Amino acid sequence: MAFLLHQARFYTTVNHLRDLPPTVQPEIAFAGRSNAGKSTAINVLCNQKRLAFASKTPGRTQHINYFSVGPADEPVANLVDLPGYGYAEVPGAAKAHWEMLLSSYLATRSQLCGLILMMDSRRPLTDLDRRMIEWFVPTGKPIHTLLTKCDKLTRQESINALRTAQKGLDAYRDQGVQGKLTVQLFSAMKRVGLDEAHELIESWVRPSVADEKSEPVAQ
């Protein structure tokens, strides 16, 4: 099966909101803790080995990286790799810059149509993960959580992790959050959940195509 994300390439990197590209294509943001496997997940989803880079020093990268998706001469979307968060040794000034950059981008970027939130399946819904959710939910746009590294869990542990994350997300719905909050297990190493993630992301950037696929065949 051919996936749209397999046509991905580096587009640009920015360090300030004023430098965000004036593109009109829909954007899918990827966020997560510095050790949640975000870069690895992006590379696997895009079927490339070195599209997204993880800093050798966790938390060091404070830039927003853009990857265009679709035909090179007529891209249909952008994947947006947000800076990793949660590394304790990052200086205070860098943390402040991170908070301003991410919170403002998530709250105000009109092209943004959904957030892919990476959480280590062994440590889901940390305080910083919740902060990311709370920055984004006022937009009413969907959040899809990938519980990464699920290959490191037993089957029962995976079930428990999924239930824990689902329960945490349900609490936001109980508070009246309008946007969709969904979650799945994911392993870049074992390629668990890859098709499910592909299909969901493509449904965000090409909803008309997704609707056509879901329509029953006329008899």
UniProtKB/Swiss-Prot annotation:
Keyword annotations from UniProtKB, A to Z: Cell cycle, Cell division, GTP-binding, Magnesium, Metal-binding, Nucleotide-binding, Septation
Superkingdom, natural source: Bacteria
Residues covered by the EngB-type G domain: 24-207
Gene Ontology CC, one term: cytosol
GO molecular function: GTP binding; metal ion binding
PROSITE patterns: G_ENGB
Name of this protein: Probable GTP-binding protein EngB
Gene Ontology biological process terms in this record: division septum assembly
Cofactors that this protein relies on: Mg(2+)
PANTHER family attached to this UniProt entry: ENGB-TYPE G DOMAIN-CONTAINING PROTEIN, MSS1/TRME-RELATED GTP-BINDING PROTEIN
Residue positions binding Mg(2+): 39, 61
Gene: engB
Function field: Necessary for normal cell division and for the maintenance of normal septation.
Record-stated family: Belongs to the TRAFAC class TrmE-Era-EngA-EngB-Septin-like GTPase superfamily. EngB GTPase family.
Residues annotated for GTP binding in this entry: 32-39, 59-63, 81-84, 148-151, 186-188
Organism from which the protein derives: Burkholderia lata (strain ATCC 17760 / DSM 23089 / LMG 22485 / NCIMB 9086 / R18194 / 383)
